[in-house]
Regions:
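Primarily NTPase-proximal linker/entry elements flanking Walker-type ATP/GTP-binding cores
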Residues: 10, 14-131, 136-181
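Short beta-strand segments
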Residues: 99-100, 182, 216, 270
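A generic structural signal for ordered alpha-helices
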Residues: 1, 18, 32, 178, ...
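Short glycine-rich anion-binding loops that position phosphate/pyrophosphate groups of nucleotides
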Residues: 184-186
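Generic hydrophobic-segment detector
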Residues: 5, 38, 90-93, 157, ...
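Conserved catalytic-core segment of NTP-binding enzymes
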Residues: 160-174, 188-292, 297
Length: 300
């Protein structure tokens, strides 16, 4: 558990530093003045906390400081209450299809996800259905070899749906625990590419109804992430999110908006380049990591 919290802390360090420094500045003040509230509002919105939750937090922060409930605790309580009705991650299905726009770290996430399940003792197959990029197929092949995972790739086929069908079919025949399918990055405004993705999902669904569709979202994209997910969901039923590049952003609050506005659970956060830098998402660890310093979060 401590390892999970530390990984989450690492991924949210930039966001946490800004918020923690601000709350430290407020320490000792019984009441925050208008300039304090304005600075807090700017910081929360800059972290992509979202306007609705920011308003709720500001309302709580305007109340006089109480020794029995610190401002930090009230901050956490606001987020917990705000997210009390959102779906939480469940056990993922056998087949996991990863989708997303270009540059979100999707192919790397496929490999990391494979490593995660393999480390848990599960048999895993990677399916290289990003047929538009030879480099992506080679990247998956290298990862599969390095992690000792099964692989389905077809250098001669340009039809991603065909590769996906073969990969999932082979994995089911071999009774593997997980089959993780990579797809090419696509602009969510391109109807033709999105319909192709729809076809990939359709052919996989003919083989099994145990399919999860996770969208990889670059945490740095902020509000654009919401629009990306909405567009993808028009063509394919998204069941969850992998937030990538969390270690490089000060906008870690975007996870809150994704969960609340899209009602999609966040399953993993990418917090680095190594294969084990894909962290299972824990709402409790996430909320603690937004504001508390490392020793407090680990010991709290």
């Amino acid at each position: 558990m401590i390892s999970l919290i530390k990984k989450t802390l690492s991924g949210l360090s930039k966001t946490r530093t800004k918020l923690s420094n601000l709350f430290a500045k407020f320490s000792g003040k019984s009441i925050l003045d208008d300039s304090d509230i304005e600075e807090l509002e700017e910081t929360l919105l800059g972290a992509d906390i979202g306007w609705e939750l920011t308003e709720s937090i500001l309302e709580k922060m305007r109340e006089p400081d109480k020794k029995e409930v610190s401002r930090e605790e009230r901050f956490q309580q606001c987020i917990q209450q705000y997210l009390s009705d959102v779906d939480q991650p469940r056990d993922l299905h056998k087949v996991i299809l990863l989708v997303g726009i270009n540059g979100t770290g999707k192919t790397t996430s496929v490999a990391k996800l494979g490593g995660y399940f393999s480390n848990a003792g599960e048999s895993v197959s990677l399916v290289a259905a990003d047929t538009y990029r030879a480099a992506a197929v080679e990247q998956i092949r290298i990862w599969a070899t390095r992690l000792n995972l099964h692989l389905t790739a077809n250098d001669k086929s340009a039809d991603p749906a065909s590769v996906a069908f073969d990969g999932v079919s082979n994995g089911i025949t071999k009774n593997l625990d997980r089959i993780i399918v990579d797809t090419s990055g696509r602009v969510h405004t391109s109807a033709n590419l999105m319909k192709e993705l729809e076809k990939i999902y359709r052919v996989i669904s003919k083989l099994t109804d145990e399919v999860d569709v996770l969208i990889t979202i670059d945490a740095n994209t902020g509000q654009n992430a919401l629009q990306q997910a909405r567009e993808f969901s028009q063509y394919i039923p998204l069941t969850g999110v992998i937030l990538t590049k969390m270690d490089g952003t000060a906008r870690g609050g975007i996870a809150i908006q994704i969960m609340k506005e899209l009602n999609l659970p966040v399953y993993f956060m990418g917090v680095g380049e190594q294969v084990d830098d894909l962290v299972p998402f824990s709402l409790d660890s996430y909320i603690k990591s937004l504001i508390l310093m490392e020793t407090e979060a680990v010991n709290g």
